[in-house]
């Protein structure tokens, strides 16, 4: 085994629904109150994981959150039995119940930020769960996210787990959706690239006007310090506020990177020429930028198709594959541009699309669904092996989903006490399948 970039995808939870909770995420709001299909959603995610496993990539699975989150609803003043808490919250504040029932943890690009051992001062892999304070429904995730990460990467000889940053607007952190890493080989020192939307302390920085900037410069700097990153190999850049106002709520909706390649839109960053120069200076010779011009692909097309919310991955033969949502194939302008790219041989060699409709309608493409974790040979062996995709796990999880998941959920179903029973039964069995221990509040 050699050092690899593994992908750990989030398993879609049993309460997957369309509550339109994410302001600034156009797909999420436009599908609000639609009827979701959790069983189809989890199977679409599993199909993507299995396909990458079959291609020879190291593919892991991260467990979902416990939802509905009865513990949080009790903290917010709803009392009685669990079924009474559900009934009262739906009666008096259906928005709170929806927020506490969200399956948004499927998008593990927001689970946290990961720095490989080649980049850190102590030579260990560092994890920091994202606090996600910009959206209430996601701000209640980080404690259990930390539990899941610790159960997946438990060996203290190789892995270091930090607490989420303080829950404050000053340190708004959205995890790996605003972070990428460039390197020549995965096991060598890389350049870690942090993208922020605003500065909390310095008012001279520009900021979006219509939609919130979810990541602060101060949060990104704090994570770089916490992970022990080397200053000369760390680059901070500001996302273009204008594209945030057009629905680009995370950097991974307008740019994606891998090894020596940055694939981004022409309007992705503020002072884009300087950003490219800073990255090239830190990386050295051979840094490759594929910049998509606005006259080829508009920001609107990029957001609607999630062109950049794709996975750039290097195959065993050294060629680069891009994993795209099926929406890209269905947009003639985007698909024509992608095929031009492949013909030009400028760093992307192969296109592969997946049908991720259930996730896409809630505002998350292929890149949202995965957390990248670079692992050397010893670290791969130290991972909880029961969380790694295999023929057996794929079959087991599909049968598990058939047993526990509904094929239809609408808003009123979130108040059904039976959904809570079903969800907890599913998660209890999942922790046994994946050998995670008691990671959920209901198991304590």
Swiss-Prot record:
Transmembrane segments: none
Residues where substrate binds: 19-28, 110, 137-138, 214, 252, 362
Name of this protein: N-succinylarginine dihydrolase
Gene Ontology biological-process annotations: arginine catabolic process to glutamate; arginine catabolic process to succinate
Highest taxon in the source lineage: Bacteria
Catalytic center residues: 174, 250, 368
Protein family membership: Belongs to the succinylarginine dihydrolase family.
Signal peptide: none
Family annotation (NCBIfam families): arg_catab_astB, PRK13281.1
Matches recorded under InterPro entries: AstB_sf, SuccinylArg_d-Hdrlase_AstB
A single GO molecular function term of this UniProt record: N-succinylarginine dihydrolase activity
């Amino acid at each position: 085994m050699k050092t690899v970039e593994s992908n750990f995808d989030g398993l879609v939870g049993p309460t997957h629904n369309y509550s339109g909770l994410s302001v600034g995420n156009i797909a999420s709001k436009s599908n609000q109150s639609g009827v979701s299909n959790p069983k189809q959603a989890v199977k679409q995610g599993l199909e993507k994981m299995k396909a990458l496993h079959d291609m020879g990539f190291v593919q892991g699975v991260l467990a979902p959150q416990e939802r509905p989150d009865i513990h949080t609803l009790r903290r917010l003043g709803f009392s009685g039995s669990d079924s009474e808490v559900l009934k009262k919250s739906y009666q008096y504040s259906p928005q709170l119940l929806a927020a506490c029932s969200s399956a948004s943890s499927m998008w593990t690009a927001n689970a946290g930020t990961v720095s490989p051992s080649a980049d850190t001062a102590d030579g260990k892999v560092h994890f920091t769960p994202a606090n996600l304070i910009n959206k209430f429904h996601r701000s209640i995730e980080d404690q259990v996210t930390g539990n899941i990460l610790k159960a997946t990467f438990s060996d203290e000889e190789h892995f270091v787990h930090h607490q989420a940053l303080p829950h404050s607007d000053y340190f708004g952190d959205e995890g790996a959706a605003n972070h990428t890493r460039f390197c020549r080989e995965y096991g060598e020192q890389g350049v870690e690239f942090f993208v922020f939307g605003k500065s909390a302390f310095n008012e001279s920085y520009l900021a979006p006007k219509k939609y919130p900037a979810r990541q602060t410069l101060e949060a990104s700097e704090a994570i770089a310090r916490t992970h022990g990153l080397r200053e000369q190999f760390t680059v901070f850049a500001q996302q273009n506020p204008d594209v945030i106002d057009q629905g680009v709520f995370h950097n991974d909706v307008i740019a994606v990177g891998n090894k020596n390649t940055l694939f981004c839109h022409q309007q992705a960053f503020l002072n884009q020429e300087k950003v490219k120069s800073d990255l090239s200076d830190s990386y050295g010779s051979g840094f490759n930028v594929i910049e998509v011009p606005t006259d080829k692909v508009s920001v609107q097309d990029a957001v609607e198709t999630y062109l950049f919310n794709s996975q750039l991955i290097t195959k065993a033969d050294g060629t680069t594959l891009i994993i795209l949502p099926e929406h890209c194939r269905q947009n003639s302008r985007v698909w024509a541009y992608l095929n031009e790219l492949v013909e030009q041989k400028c760093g992307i060699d192969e296109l592969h699309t997946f049908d991720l409709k259930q996730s896409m309608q809630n505002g998350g493409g292929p890149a949202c669904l995965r957390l990248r974790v670079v692992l050397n040979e010893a670290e791969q062996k130290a991972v909880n092996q029961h969380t790694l995709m295999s023929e057996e796990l794929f079959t087991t999880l599909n049968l598990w989903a058939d047993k526990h998941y509904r094929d239809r959920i609408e808003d009123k179903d979130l108040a059904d006490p039976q959904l809570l029973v079903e969800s907890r039964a599913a998660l209890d069995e999942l922790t046994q399948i994946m050998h995670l221990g008691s990671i959920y509040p209901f198991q304590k």
